[in-house]
Design a protein with these regions (language model features):
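Fe-S ferredoxin-like electron-transfer domains
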Residues: 46, 50, 56-168, 174, ...
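A generic secondary-structure micro-motif detector
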Residues: 9-10, 162
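N-terminal cofactor/phosphate-binding cores enriched in small/glycine residues
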Residues: 11-60, 64, 69-70, 83-84
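Extreme N-terminal starter segment of soluble prokaryotic enzymes
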Residues: 1-3
Length: 201
């Protein structure tokens, strides 16, 4: 077992555990959007940032991918963490103004507006890749993937062409943290629209 501290409270977890998993075991809340227990974590959304301190030295780490280690000191609500979280929420509100899920989570942490320019009022996708990982790791397919790059990056079928690889299992719709895949699923399939039966995760 590994012993370390979260918010000055000593905790004990199994080796190989991440900081986020440890925090959840002890009922310590850390916000996330791109994390799901069923797939490999990626740290894409960065909402789960926490502060790792060692004396006068400290750094921010993504708790969903940072492994626990003996004797480390983790803080989840320092001023630095809250400032970074605030900025991330503001960027997500500008990137995904159409997502009620993001708005609700941001409001829970005191963020109700953004200083950044909004390009598309209907956009919901934050391009975290959770849906693509679920399609590959849970379903065993790669019907969807990251398309394009930079500010043009989005989620879609390879080469932005309808594909027969999609089996309409609904896994991507179920796991999507922002609700974006609800409106995108029919653009992926090459067959007519179907009624999805979401996969229980």
């Amino acid at each position: 077992m590994i012993k370390f501290n979260i918010n000055d409270i000593e905790v004990e977890v199994e080796p190989g555990c991440t900081v986020l998993e440890a925090a959840r075991q002890y009922g310590i809340e850390i916000p996330t959007l791109c994390y799901h227990e069923a797939v490999t974590p990626s740290g894409a959304c960065r909402l789960c940032m926490v502060e790792l301190k060692d004396g006068d030295w400290s750094k921010l780490v993504a708790s969903c991918i940072y492994p626990v280690a003996e004797g480390i000191n983790i803080y989840t609500e320092t001023e630095r963490v809250q400032n970074v979280r605030n900025w991330i929420f503001q960027m997500l509100l500008a990137q995904c103004p159409g997502s009620m899920e993001i708005k609700k989570l941001a409001e829970k942490y005191g963020v109700t507006s953004t200083r950044f320019a909004i390009q598309n009022q209907d956009e919901e996708c934050m391009v975290c890749g959770l849906c693509t990982r679920a399609c590959e790791e849970i379903v065993g397919l790669s019907a969807i993937s990251m398309v394009d790059r930079g500010v043009y990056k989005t989620i879609g079928s390879p080469f932005v062409q309808p594909t027969e690889v999609c089996v309409a299992c609904g896994c991507c719709v179920t796991i999507c943290p922002t609700g974006a895949m609800r409106s995108r699923i029919d653009t992926v399939r090459s067959t007519p629209p179907v009624t999805l039966t979401p996969l229980a995760l």
